[in-house]
Amino acid sequence: MKQKLLILVTMVSMMSCTATQDLPTVEKVELTRYQGLWYEIARLPNSFEKGLDCVTATYTLKSNGKIDVLNRGYSTVKGKYKSARGTARVPDPDEPGKLKVSFFWPFSGNYYILQLDDEYRYALVGDPSRKYLWILSRTKDLDGTVYTSLMEHAKNSGFNTGQVTETGQKCERPDQ
């Protein structure tokens, strides 16, 4: 129940934020290539991931075009994994980099793909309020040059990159 309440508060917060300027996204996303396991390399701190390491997101494309979302992370405080399930969708096919994600109906938040590697090896994801930002990778580590480039793009897009924290990926994962 506490987790649902936390997700509800988070989604309401995300919805209540308004962008001070437009946030450009990638022009093309092939969801069949985007689906799968992503490791969180870094993020802007947020309440729903506080104290979590080894954070992953798994996206599974459904036949109706929606995407199942499974976020997992290891709670360093509780000593166990936490997970949250949701659904994502692309509201406007002309803007495939702008998704809506819902973990608790009827609330949803923005999930904007700001940068995406041509080979779908890494991505920069944020929202127009500039309060949420993630660097994702298909592997647990990301080349330093790529990381720096993504951080520079985030900074130029108006994100407070000085607050970004790296996400540890050194946990024991019994399921992987």
Model regions and ranges:
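Sec-dependent N-terminal signal peptides
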Residues: K4-M14
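A beta-rich soluble binding module of mature secreted/lumenal proteins
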Residues: C17-Q176
